[in-house]
Amino acid sequence: KLKILGKHEEFTLYVAVAISNTLENAEEHLWELAKYVDGWGRIHLVERLSETNDPNIKHWMITEGYKNNIMYEYLALICAVTGDLKFELLKANPSPEIMQAAGEIIGALISGGPAEDINSYKDAGDVVKLYLEHSLGKDNSLNQFLILNSIKNYASNQETNWNELSSNGWTDDLRVN
């Protein structure tokens, strides 16, 4: 009955607390509930799943978890870190699903907003480089082109303190190319 109540966004946070405090295997229940909500409820649940080690939840975090009807920016960093986006992009041929999600996550991180942005992501430079390498020579969609353009605009911003961001993998070579 808690899950039924939790599917209503205005009650999701309270149900998440109740599930976390009373049910065994709470993580599985929170994940199941997160699939049914897409507003603030999803945001609250994904935040509570940020410490997961479950490979299925980690994959979901990258491919679906960041998506919400408020702002992708709220969950982009959590999902990139929890789902280990860098690891997924280190694979020789990431799936189209991973590439689309990676682009949307990178785009949200660059957009910034009220949540932590790309400057807070320790793997930012590596993830962007891998995304660019996988995108090279492909027939990119309009959405992918827009993401590539936002990467270019971000990397060419002269006002950014690139020395400070070098610890996040931003090299001069990456920014020039």
What are the residue ranges of the model-derived segments?
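Long terminal segments
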Residues: 55, 69-71, 87-89, 93
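Alpha-helical structural signal with a strong bias for long, charge-/Ser/Thr/Gly-rich
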Residues: 1, 24, 55-60, 71, ...
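Structural detector for internal amphipathic alpha-helices that build alpha-solenoid repeat scaffolds
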Residues: 1, 12-24, 32-33, 43-52, ...
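Flexible loop/turn segments at the boundaries of HEAT repeats in alpha-solenoid HEAT proteins
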Residues: 25-31, 55-61, 72-73, 114-120
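Eukaryotic alpha-helical scaffold "rod" segments
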Residues: 1-2, 7-10, 38, 156-159, ...
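Short alpha-helical linear motifs
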Residues: 26-29, 40-42, 58, 84-87
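Long internal repeat-built scaffold domains in very large eukaryotic proteins
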Residues: 78-177
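HEAT/HEAT-like alpha-solenoid repeats
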Residues: 2-7, 28-35, 59-70
